[in-house]
Amino acid sequence: MGSSGDDGYRLLNEYTNGFMVSQVLFAACELGVFDLLAEAPGPLDVAAVAAGVEASSHGTELLLDTCVSLKLLKVETRAGKAFYQNTELSSAYLTRVSPTSQCNLLKYMGRTSYGCWGHLADAVREGKNQYLQTFGVPAEDLFKAIYRSEGERLQFMQALQEVWSVNGRSVLTAFDLSGFPLMCDLGGGPGALAKECLSLYPGCKVTVFDVPEVVRTAKQHFSFPEEEEIHLQEGDFFKDPLPEADLYILARILHDWADGKCSHLLERVYHTCKPGGGILVIESLLDEDRRGPLLTQLYSLNMLVQTEGQERTPTHYHMLLSSAGFRDFQFKKTGAIYDAILVRK
């Protein structure tokens, strides 16, 4: 018989209360706690933080102390009063002024992903995403559901921008891409990977190919100082002619779709691709036995509740890519969240 002191019960409680940890993080970001502390000339007490974020002193104190335990804040006591400031972690990832800020990603996950995950049991029963149950939006056209308002589309694109601000370099240097001077980022949204390509491979040019509403949002809300090297082109990669390129980048694209749609897209790329050209697939790869990594398994469940796809093993991607005609399959586990696959025509 287990007891409240055994390791199994403690682990169960850690899992059970995991959603509370996420909500502490989401709430502190939404309230602007980390931004307020970043802008302050020194550590702030509870009263100053509560006033700055327009919240109750009682609730603010509870939130701040929990953030300390989560190593998101640090605290010092002076004359019996607690003063709080950001840690290196929160300064790097949870303040809007940081170049590696993840604030928009957390905002998106806290409002959209978290809502869909509340219907995980329904998603498992039905085998489909939960936009209709969560937001009342039909998901027959997946990205009409994902981009269900201008605000949601911008939030999603800002989240992608932040993902690649941290993860772009590791996947774009997994292989030497200097032999591909003309690149096309299919579904490249805000152009974050395109900019990283220019930084890593001087002299290359990148076309960002995405649906018209995404391209319009990108032009309105994201800066493109490298206008001659980055071209934004409107189109649907499932049906419109694809831009000419030496390398096509599919970053977090294939995991959105079932195998049939993936095969259709890959065949379209193959027929457009020049001999010797290739595809760089960027995804979080499951181990071959599908028993891990845990984060990738969770991402695969996220694909269930939010998309039509799943995360896959290297062998699964090999099957999809080789069936479309590609050869010279290589994959590399980067040690970061996302991995890379390179194939050629």
Swiss-Prot record:
One of its GO terms (biological process) is melatonin biosynthetic process. Pathway: Aromatic compound metabolism; melatonin biosynthesis; melatonin from serotonin: step 1/2. The active site is at residue 255. Its EC number is 2.1.1.4. It catalyses: N-acetylserotonin + S-adenosyl-L-methionine = melatonin + S-adenosyl-L-homocysteine + H(+). Belongs to the class I-like SAM-binding methyltransferase superfamily. Cation-independent O-methyltransferase family. Catalyzes the transfer of a methyl group onto N-acetylserotonin, producing melatonin (N-acetyl-5-methoxytryptamine). Transmembrane segments: none annotated. The keyword Lipoprotein does not apply. S-adenosyl-L-methionine binds at residues 147, 164, 210, 235-237, 252. Keywords: Lipid metabolism, Melatonin biosynthesis, Methyltransferase, S-adenosyl-L-methionine, Transferase. Induction: No night/day variations. Homodimer. Highly expressed in pineal gland. In the retina, 10- to 100-fold lower expression compared to pineal gland, if any. Pfam families: Dimerisation, Methyltransf_2. PANTHER family: O-METHYLTRANSFERASE CICE, PUTATIVE (AFU_ORTHOLOGUE AFUA_4G14580)-RELATED. CDD domains: AdoMet_MTases. It comes from Macaca mulatta (Rhesus macaque). Disulfide bonds: none annotated. InterPro entries: COMT-like, O_MeTrfase_dom, Plant_O-MeTrfase_dimerisation, SAM-dependent_MTases_sf, WH-like_DNA-bd_sf, WH_DNA-bd_sf. Substrate binds at residues 256, 302, 306. One of its GO terms (molecular function) is acetylserotonin O-methyltransferase activity. This is Acetylserotonin O-methyltransferase.
